[in-house]
Structures are given as structure tokens and as C-alpha cells.
Amino acid sequence: MSRQNKGCDDLVQGRSHNQKDVILNQTIYGLLALLPIVLCGIFLIGLQWSAKKTMPIILVVTAALAIFIWDMTLNRVSSSIIQGLVITVSVLWIVFGAIFLLNTLKHTGAIAVIRAGFTNVSPDRRVQAIIIAWCFGCFLEGASGFGTAAAIAAPLLVAIGFPALGAVLMGMMIQSTPVSFGAVGTPIVIGVNNGLDKAAISAQLAQEGVQWGEFLQLITSQVAIIHGVIGTFMPLFMVMMLTRFFGKNKSWKEGFAIWPFAIFAGLAFTIPYMITGVFLGPEFPSLVGGLVSIAIVVNAAKRGFLVPKTTWDFAPQKNWPSEWLGKLVVSKEDITLTLSDKKMSTLMAWFPYLLVALLLVFSRVFTGFQSLLNSVAVDLTSILGETDISASFSPLYLPGGLLLISALVAAAFQTRKPVSALNSAFKESTKTVLGAGFVLVFTIPMVRIFINSGVNLSDVASMPVASAELFAGTFDNVFPLISATIGALGAFIAGSNTVSNMMFSQFQYEAAMSLHISPSLIIAAQAVGAAAGNMVAIHNVVAASATVGLLGMEGATLRRTILPTIYYVLFCGIIVMAAIYIFGFQGPLA
């Protein structure tokens, strides 16, 4: 063998070894990045620890990985923690607003009227869950997003007689279909739009005569259609979960018995949702779908359309397990005393919630009003000198501020003793928020360290990207099947569809391009999966639980919400696989 040939062989072998080393390193980093997530699952679901006990440990583990494995500077880790604490204040502000409004309405007597109103629509708890959680919750998600729907719907369900754990489960399950277009389209308009390399992709699209706006609208349409198919069955899934885990007979069948009404309610939302998404864009599908479904489903329920003749209810409250009960209690005695004092119209009782919805829409749609609310803010830019780490707290623009405004209006118009009602509501709400605050103080800083780990001295991919690359490398040609799972993983970590889309949209795009399949469809799967991941996002569960005073039971909620999450990402994966490999969908750049 000549020296030249031997040298070539050595070079090839060297490259081969280098490639193996790179793959090995990527695998190790990917596995280590998953460690905090795996430990969360083991502690919360396997060992049934509370989040109060789990999350401080997970924060320490994540910080240790960031410093010793990812070579993040201590300064960057510290700035991420500060950023997380500011975000925690924002989350707790929303939670406090939701609880404060509910407690105010309890003391004005409005909750008694609302409870009676739902009984008049239908005494069937399955129907009540569909109307409040699905229809009203989807509308709230479209208007506000960021967990507000669950924070408002869960205490409202408790107020009309649902067990706290069941109310949280229903609230978490609506963190799915409407989420991709929540907060007037933020997960798409901000998340996907800013998560992609717009300049580079626009140049590639231009070669095919496609503009950036058209590409983003194509993604929006695909997200709406995928959600529309899967989401149609979510109301049925919700009531089946309700009867299985909270019915006296522990029966799936009792939930399935209402399938005609549940599917009808699903379609009442998803049809206008899909039409709006395809023809009008990402801002209004959840808003329009929610409004239309409220009008149609409430009227149908009043007329008994498709509602089973046999009414389903929970067992008497005295027979409920202690884990079902939260600290938010609306007793029958309170209701009787309140109603004996004065009568209140149904419209007046509901007015504070209608005002919340109106303020949310106005603050997200009208830029002048939006700017006015945002003028009161605390902004931290370049925290500890880290130019890409910042945080802000806008008390009036955040839903918490709008909820507080509605509570003040409610006290002014619904009772002759507004100061007394507000004082009692404040004391009760503060106790609940302080309990949730302890958990979130550890949870959200952990998330920010995880997300900000991409800037490091080792020049390795961030923890989210490393874990996603591990999935992609493992699944190769069946990657479309798990692309939604990656999106869900991002939301599980960050507690946000928007943040998951910002983290993983470019990664999903690159994976699609390398496999020569439709990048728009894979990014759509990312967005759908990220919406589904909100059902198991830890700090969303903690926040929703806090609104009903149910702390320490996060694992019990997660063990249940994992079922609809698996359904969602699996169904999405099957739809995307079928679109690509059976129906041959391509689209731009495929």
C-alpha cells in the first residue's frame, strides 16, 4: 500500500472517529438535558411527591448541570434566576387576580346566582363542565392565554359544586386546542415568527415565489386543521375523565353516554375555529370559536338538544376523598344567607366575567389601550449584564390587573358593603397565593436556566435543543410522528406554547429540510404539540391548583393530564405522518 493511500485511509478513519465522538457527545448532552425532566416525572408522578418538595431539588440539579456540564457562567445562571423570579411575580399576579375576583363574587352573592343559572341551563355536571371549561375556557384562552383560562374556569367550577381536583383537571384539559391561538395568536405571531431564521428562510421561499407572510399563514392553516380534527373530541375526553376519576361509579361509560352532545360542542368550537384560522389568520380562531360555541351550546343545553335524559352528578360532598378538596370553599350556608339579603339578576352576576373578557379583547386588539396599560411597567433589561436576558412586569396589562379591576367593579355594583367584601376576599386570596408562590419561586427560575443554557463556554447547544436533537437522531424517518412530542416537551419545560415555539421552530425546520419533507407541516406539528404540552406544564398545574387552594396535589393532576396529552401528540403525529407519506403533501421548500 502506498504512503498516499495509507494517509487517505488514516484521514478517513480520523474523520469517522471524530463523527462518532460528535454523535456520542450529542447523545450524552441530550440524555443529561433530559435529567431534570425525568426526575420531575419520578418525583411528582412515580413517588407522588408534592411540587413543594420536588421543585427546589430540580432547580439545584438544573443549575448544577448548567454550571458544571454546560459551562454556563455563574453570572448567567444568576441572571436567569432573577429573570425567573420576575416572571413568577407576573404569574402570581394573574393567579391572585383570578382568586380575588372569585372570592369577591362569593361575598357579593354573585356566585350563588351563577351556580343557580348553570343549574337552570342543565343540572348535569357533564354539561356544566363542557359549557364552563370548554366553551367559556376556550374563549378566555383566545383572549388572554398564558394559563388564564384555567385560572378563571377552575375556581368557577368549584363555586358551582365541582371537587377542586376535578375542576383543576377540567381547567388543565382546555390548555390544548385553543392554546395555539391564545392571547390573540401570540404562540404563532410571536413564537413561531420569532423562532425561525426569517431572513434565511425568506430568501429560500423567494426562489419559489412565496412570501414570508404566505408561509406563516400556511403554518397557521395547518395548525388550525390539525387542532380542529383532534380538538373535536376533547369535550368527550373531558367528561369521560370527569366520570372515571370523580364519579361514584368510576365509569368511563357514564362520560361516553353524552357523546352526541360532547361531539356537538366540539364541532361548535372547531368548525368556526378552523374557518377563521384558514381564512383570517392566527389572531382570532380561539376567540371566534369560543364565542360561537358559547352561543350555540348554551342554547342547545337549555332546550335539551342531544342531552341525555339521565342526569349525572357527583356523590355527596361528605363522601369525597380529602385529596379532592381545596381551600376554596363556597358553602351552602353562605349562599343561603347572601340570597336572603338581596336578589341579583343573572346578567349582573355574570357582568364581572363579561367585563374581564371585554377588557382582555380590547387590551390585545386596540394598540392605544394596550400602550396605555403597558405604560405602567417594571422593565429589567440586560440583567447582570447579560444582553439577551430581560424581564418585565406590567401589572395593568397582565390579566391579573384586569381581573382586579373587574373585582372592584363587582364590589361597587353588587353589594351595599363593598369594603367588607373586598377586605374578606383579599385576606382569603392572599393566603392561597402565598402557598403557590413558594413552588413557583423554584419552578420558573429552573425553566429560565434551562432555556438560557445555549450561551455557554463549551459552545454546545442549549438543553432544550440537545434533548430535541436526541429525539430527532433516534427516530430519523419517523420524525414526523414525534415532532409534536418535542413541542410538548418544550411546553412541559417552559409552561408556554409561545416559548416552546421560539425554542424549537428552527430546529423542526432544519429537521424537515434534512428529511426532504414539508417544513411548514412539521412546524405546525410543533405548534400543536406545544399546545398539548400545556396540559402537563408544571407551573401551569401549580397556578391552576392555587386558584382553588389545592396545593401539594400536583402529581395527582399530572397523572391524569398525561392521558389527554398522549392522545393529542400521538393523534397529531399520525395525522402528519399520513399527510406526508400517504397523501404526499409537500408544500413550499419540501
What is the role of each PLM region?
Residues S78-V86, V91-P163, V168-L169, R416-A511:
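Membrane-embedded alpha-helical segments and adjacent helix-loop junctions characteristic
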Residues R126-C138, A164-T177, I190, Q204-P235, ...:
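Alpha-helical transmembrane segments of multi-pass membrane proteins
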Residues L32-I42, W49-W70, L92-A98, G266, ...:
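Hydrophobic mid-bilayer segments of alpha-helices in multi-pass membrane transport proteins
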Residues G289, N319-I486:
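Transmembrane helical segments that form the transport core of multi-pass membrane transport proteins
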Residues I23-Y29, Q48-K52, S78-T88, L218-I226, ...:
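Interfacial loop-to-helix junctions that mark the boundaries of transmembrane helices
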Residues T104-H107, G185-A200, T367-N374, F442-M463, ...:
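Extracellular/periplasmic helix-exit of transmembrane alpha-helices
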Residues S180-G266, T270-N319, V528-A590:
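Juxtamembrane and boundary regions of transmembrane helices in multi-pass small-molecule transporters
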Residues P187-L218, V455-D476, M503-F507, L515:
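Membrane-interface interhelical connector segments
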